[in-house]
Regions:
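Binuclear metal-dependent hydrolase catalytic cores
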Residues: 1-153, 159-161, 223-246
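Cap/insert and terminal regions of metallo-dependent hydrolase folds
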Residues: 160-245
Length: 246
């Protein structure tokens, strides 16, 4: 099983080295920031997306969804597509359809299943998907993806603590917008530091931790790597287009 990151930057990240958040694992797209569709095509994974999990409605996590849906129309998709999201996505999609932003309503071509709610659950391919509300400046859902063989937890954006009582995951994909020296700023803006992400992975008994949603303050990336590995050695600061074996 492979985990591929298409965007690993925070919404404030300047430049193209780290694009807006998105990652792919076995048919599931985790968030859909700007640029995700092109990178899915580059990796020959666009046609393998069966479900999209949107953590929250800040534009860096959802702005690429309209490009994705447009491409499903252009390519004549016939297979169902499931989108899981917190409340609020359906009126955005309706407005986009009213404006003909995707050329035509995708649901005219295929079954578009929108599973929207405060704690939605879904089954997508082999995955059992459970949403877990996490603390951010807007309503944010973390997602636990489970099969009989593995559990993956993806946080979206959150301030510490991220781990819900009793939650367990083999692999944790955790945001780390700030280094520890900016912990107060992280809390103010609803984000996490590297050490906080490491603590969440420890609490979830994770085997491996991936950090994403990296900020671009001077020195942040090097500090984040040092700080997370000091607390949780089997950690990786994900890179755009990075592919990792699970």
């Amino acid at each position: 099983m492979k985990l591929t990151f298409f965007g690993t930057g925070a919404g404030s990240f300047r430049g193209s080295r780290r694009q807006m958040p998105s990652a792919f694992v076995e048919g599931i797209l985790l968030d859909c920031g700007a640029g995700a569709t092109g990178r899915l095509h580059d990796a020959a994974l666009f046609d393998r997306v069966e479900g999209i999990l949107i953590t929250h409605l800040h534009t860096d996590h959802v702005s690429g969804l309209f490009d994705f849906l447009l491409h499903t129309v252009i390519q004549g998709r016939k297979r169902p597509l499931t989108i899981v999201s917190p409340p609020g996505l359906s009126p955005i999609l309706r407005a986009a359809n009213d404006a003909r932003a995707m050329a035509r309503d995708p649901s005219e071509l295929y079954e578009l299943r929108l599973v929207e709610g405060s704690e939605p659950e879904a089954t997508i391919g082999p995955w059992r998907v459970q949403a877990v509300p996490l603390d951010h400046t807007v309503y944010n859902l973390g997602y636990l993806l489970a099969t009989d063989d593995a559990k993956i937890f993806y946080t979206g954006d959150t301030r510490q603590p991220s781990a819900s009582d009793g939650l367990r995951a083999d692999f944790v994909i955790h945001e780390s917008t700030y280094a520890d020296r900016n912990a107060d700023q992280a809390h103010e803006y609803g984000h996490s530091t590297a050490s906080q992400a490491a603590q969440a992975a420890i609490e979830m008994h994770a085997r491996r931790l991936f950090l994403t949603h990296i900020g671009d303050l001077e020195g942040t990336e090097a500090e984040v790597l040092h700080e997370v590995r000091a607390a949780f050695p089997d950690s990786t600061v994900a890179e755009d287009c990075g592919e990792y074996d699970l």
